[in-house]
Amino acid sequence: GLCLFKINDLTNEMEILDTHLINIRKPDHNYDYLEERHGFETVRMLRLEDELDRYLTEKISEYQCIDLLIYESHFFNVRRPTAAIPLVRFMQVTERACVNHGIMMVTVSPQQMKRTIGISRELAKADKFAVKTKIQALIDRRMIHFTGSLDDISEHEIDAMGIGYTQMIIDKLLVDNPS
């Protein structure tokens, strides 16, 4: 999930410009030959890279500049360490896209995001509904300006909003006004 935003210094709001879900689950027959020769995981990374590059190119053209990409750091079940491999590969794809487009990249952990948006440490494994509820509360408090409905976007795009909000609080570009 991707979330493109800017900070409004006058209103102290994170203004959501766009959200996007990279969906490579639906078949794309343009990649069939490559998949036969190189396997599913390699083609999955190629598709992710192509989609991310298309999105960044389009948004840089539209907004003239993207300064920072905030990436949710890896988390995986330690009982299945091979699950980390595609996550690391996708981070490499993302880093390469950032380098190619002149965008700085930082990472934020899911736990740090959850604490920043107001989920207690005890609920570190909070479900998606808890995250959605807290993001909606930030929208209601006008910390995040989003003209759409959270019901119309994916949980990954909602997470991306939380990750972006967290980094802006860390960088002190937003001041959280609990009310």
Predicted features, each with a name:
Residues 1-179:
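Phosphate- and other anionic-substrate recognition elements at nucleic-acid/protein interfaces
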